[in-house]
């Protein structure tokens, strides 16, 4: 399954219940990560914040099983009853938070570029290939 920028991913193994917004290119999904796909793509901000809510994270942690490594079953999770607000509320929420959602993606991309620059520059500074004035 191909991952597109803005897709919401959910960890199913290890640190179960951790969600993030995908960014970048050429990402693929494996069996221990779930892709959360709302029927309406405009609802991505709501889905992201819902799965980051402390009550939802707690629910997912309580559903996880396994002694050596915790595993969250998507089947078990999908059977849980969760209170969902009205469609009009979700639309209002998303229209007010879409810019924040986009900013998260942008900042993640910028952080990635800064990490790449650090990884290039730090060895050069340590080897004195370049100097800071």
What does each of the following model-derived ranges do?
Residues 41-42, 46-49, 57-67, 75-133:
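Amphipathic alpha-helical coiled-coil/heptad-repeat segments
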Residues 1-52, 56, 66-68, 73-75:
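A short beta-sheet element
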């Amino acid at each position: 399954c191909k991952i597109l920028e803005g897709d919401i991913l959910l960890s199913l193994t290890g640190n179960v219940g951790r969600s993030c917004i995908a960014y970048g290119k050429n990402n693929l999904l494996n069996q221990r990560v779930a892709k959360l796909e709302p029927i309406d793509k405009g609802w991505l901000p709501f889905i992201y914040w819902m799965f980051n809510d402390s009550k939802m994270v707690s629910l997912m942690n309580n559903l996880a099983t396994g002694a050596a490594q915790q595993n969250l079953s998507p089947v078990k999770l999908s059977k849980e009853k969760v209170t969902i607000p009205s469609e009009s509320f979700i639309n209002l929420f998303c229209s007010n938070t879409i810019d924040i959602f986009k900013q998260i993606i942008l900042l993640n991309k910028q952080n990635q570029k800064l990490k790449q620059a650090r990884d290039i520059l730090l060895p050069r500074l340590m080897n004195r290939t370049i100097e800071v004035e």
